[in-house]
């Protein structure tokens, strides 16, 4: 489908820079620039799609990277479609899997979807967000429609997908229904007539299928924008609940603030790029000040306050800062403490205490836990069998013994 060309103005270039900020890939960038130019010239907003399968009930900051990008594009005046994959969740996304993902029940999906959107609304503007469910068009397809859809894509193309190839070569079963997942996600773009689809880097194949299917159905092809996976608080692996290196957006303000203050100075700038709504010019100016001798802690406090304020309130952010500073002022947590690396993650708290030099023996470690004298990241340890996964933790025994423990696998 052809459209009249519109000029690439400085305003379009500025919009394109916002889209590119922090992204991994923007395909095809020249096409997207033309879409932006046409939108500015005609006043017709682009249709920007983000699909999420509600496979878990809670969202952490890693999930918000792509939501932040949606909000930035939403603030440019474009139509944002928050697509809940209630139908595709019953299949299970095979992206990045070494085995078949178990499907969810309708009840699980409905429960998770409510929580997902409520939390996503803390980033997106609900008044300007279109919510859709892909069961709207997938349920009516039926067997005939599903077969017709499947006829538009080849097995050879499907096997270009890295995780399918790896499983096939390794003799790991691939169920036929798993081929349907990227097809149905792609068909979502056809049903919604999407101009741009967003996703994580692990979703690139699925997003490209949508682009190809739109061509098959005679539509203008969507562009795709992939966002990187956020590194967790340990600075090593992607943010994940299973790794214990995550910051949940529904966490208490003080906990959220404290975890953000625990990240390294280097990782802080990556968080600024992917999580902050401050302009790149503002961030560059702040970085120049830090490079010029200003305390990096000031920049970290500003980031922590911004994020806590977004998911709670400015008042909660101020209170979290006050509580954090009080702990240092009262000698609760020193700014400087020994740093210890402990291997063998996941590792038990009793051994961690010994390895960190906070206790002299296992019996002393056990006694301190039983007496409530051990804290990890400020939280009292009540279970002597507690296991900690890989990550960085502030471990405290009594009032005066502290160590920053980096737990590695």
UniProtKB/Swiss-Prot annotation:
Short motif 'KMSKS' region, span: 238-242
Residue span of motif 'HIGH' region: 54-63
Cross-referenced Pfam families: SYY_C-terminal, tRNA-synt_1b
The organism's place on the tree of life at top rank: Bacteria
GO biological process: tyrosyl-tRNA aminoacylation
All copies of domain S4 RNA-binding, residue ranges: 347-407
Classification via HAMAP family: Tyr_tRNA_synth_type2
Upper lineage: Bacteria, Pseudomonadati, Pseudomonadota, Betaproteobacteria, Burkholderiales
Subunit record text: Homodimer.
Molecular function GO labels: ATP binding; RNA binding; tyrosine-tRNA ligase activity
Keyword presence, ATP-binding: yes
Function: Catalyzes the attachment of tyrosine to tRNA(Tyr) in a two-step reaction: tyrosine is first activated by ATP to form Tyr-AMP and then transferred to the acceptor end of tRNA(Tyr).
Assigned EC number: 6.1.1.1
The protein's name: Tyrosine--tRNA ligase
The UniProt record lists the keyword ATP-binding: yes
Subcellular location: Cytoplasm
């Amino acid at each position: 489908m052809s459209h009249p060309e519109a000029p690439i103005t400085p305003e379009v270039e500025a919009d394109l820079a916002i889209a590119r900020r922090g992204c991994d890939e923007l395909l095809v960038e020249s096409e997207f620039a033309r879409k932006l130019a046409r939108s500015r010239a005609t006043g017709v907003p682009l249709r920007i799609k983000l699909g999420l399968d509600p496979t878990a009930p809670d969202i952490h900051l890693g999930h918000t990277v792509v939501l932040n990008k949606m909000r930035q594009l939403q603030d440019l005046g474009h139509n944002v479609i928050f697509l809940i994959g209630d139908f595709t969740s019953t299949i299970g996304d095979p992206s990045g899997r070494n085995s078949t993902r178990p499907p969810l029940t309708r009840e699980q999906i409905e429960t998770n979807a409510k929580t997902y959107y409520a939390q996503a609304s803390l980033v997106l503007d609900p008044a300007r967000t279109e919510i859709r469910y892909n069961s709207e068009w997938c349920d009516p397809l039926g067997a005939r429609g599903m077969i017709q859809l499947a006829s538009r894509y080849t097995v050879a193309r499907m096997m270009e997908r890295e995780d399918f190839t790896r499983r096939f070569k390794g003799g790991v079963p691939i169920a036929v229904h798993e081929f349907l997942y990227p097809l149905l996600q792609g068909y979502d773009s056809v049903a919604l007539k999407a101009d741009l689809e967003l996703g994580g880097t692990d979703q690139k194949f699925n997003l490209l299928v949508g682009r190809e299917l739109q061509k098959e159905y005679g539509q203008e092809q969507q562009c795709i924008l992939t966002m990187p996976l956020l590194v967790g608080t340990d600075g090593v692996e992607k943010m994940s609940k299973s790794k214990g290196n995550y910051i949940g957006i529904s966490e208490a303000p003080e906990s959220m603030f404290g975890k953000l203050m625990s990240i390294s100075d280097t990782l802080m700038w990556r968080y600024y790029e992917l999580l902050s709504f401050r302009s790149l010019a503002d961030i560059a100016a702040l970085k120049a000040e830090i490079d010029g001798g200003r305390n990096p802690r000031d920049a970290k406090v500003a980031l922590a306050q911004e994020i806590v304020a977004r998911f709670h309130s400015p008042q909660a952010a101020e209170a979290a800062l006050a509580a954090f500073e009080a702990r240092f002022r009262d000698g609760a947590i020193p700014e400087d403490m020994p740093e210890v690396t402990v291997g063998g993650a996941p590792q038990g708290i009793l051994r961690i205490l010994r390895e960190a030099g906070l206790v002299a023996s296992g019996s002393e470690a056990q006694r301190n836990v039983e007496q409530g004298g051990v804290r990890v990241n400020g939280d009292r340890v009540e279970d002597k069998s507690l296991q900690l996964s890989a990550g960085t933790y502030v471990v405290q025994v009594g009032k005066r013994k502290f160590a920053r423990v980096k737990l590695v696998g």
